Amino acid sequence: MTIPRVLFITGKGGTGKSTVAAAIALALSRRRPTTLADLDRRMSAAAALGATPTDSTAVKVTETLDVIALTPRAELEAFIERIVPIRAISRRMLRSRTFGYVTAALPGLEAFLLLERLRIMAGDAALEDRYLVIDAPASGSAVELLSVSSGVKGIAPAGTLNRLADSIDSFLGDATRFGAVITTTPEDLAVREALETAATIRERLGVVTVAAIMNCVPDLLFDTSELASLSPLGGHARLAVRRNCAHENAALVAPRFADAGLSTINLPMMFTPAIGRHELEKLGRVLDAQLIGR
């Protein structure tokens, strides 16, 4: 499979989206230079890699991997500074009450300019032969983010914003430049949300989902007879049953993704209190074999 230049990682909250984004970025950086753009307010993906970006300046994690923090408000300010290059005037505009009224009258403008920044970064990545991995918001907010250009077109049917919206739509619909990776866990609610997200972004926006990542899949430790022998252990036996169920559920839901035209990749459960570089390396090896190198 050809990996698109930009991978947009999203999924239901609690499915390990940021961990997967960090692991994919680390795995890709073994092959060519990669940038991880962290859109999460908590900067979880950046933190897992040991980086603490504080603004729109990239922080180097390794020789081939850097991390950047992006926020909608910062992109709005950067846009104003580009079109009003005299800093004193642009700063005054951003602080003015009138400007606040204007942005309130254009819902989604900040998110729209964030998408435009990602499109520009994707173009730069193509020129520099690098990958861009985006730790996006959880799936509901991610769909809103990806859909924002249609709202801007409705408000601005002509002019600069409309032209930018056309460029963004073209970017999102180009499978060589942009693709989504959706995280899930073996639980039914997470699986349903992943399938709904993939269908929505495909039908509404033409966005291709590269793969569904089934995260936190434990190994099968006990067969049925062994589980029965554990019953005197009470709570420990219940944990063993729950672990087996999670493993079996991952196999049971795979056909649902296949029916939707999606391949699934299982990532093992990391039985650690926190995810760090060691765990990301382990997950990255699985992703390199099953997603990147296949």
Enumerate the language-model features and the residues they cover.
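N-terminal phosphate/diphosphate-binding loop that engages ATP/GTP or pyrophosphate donors
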Residues: 26-94
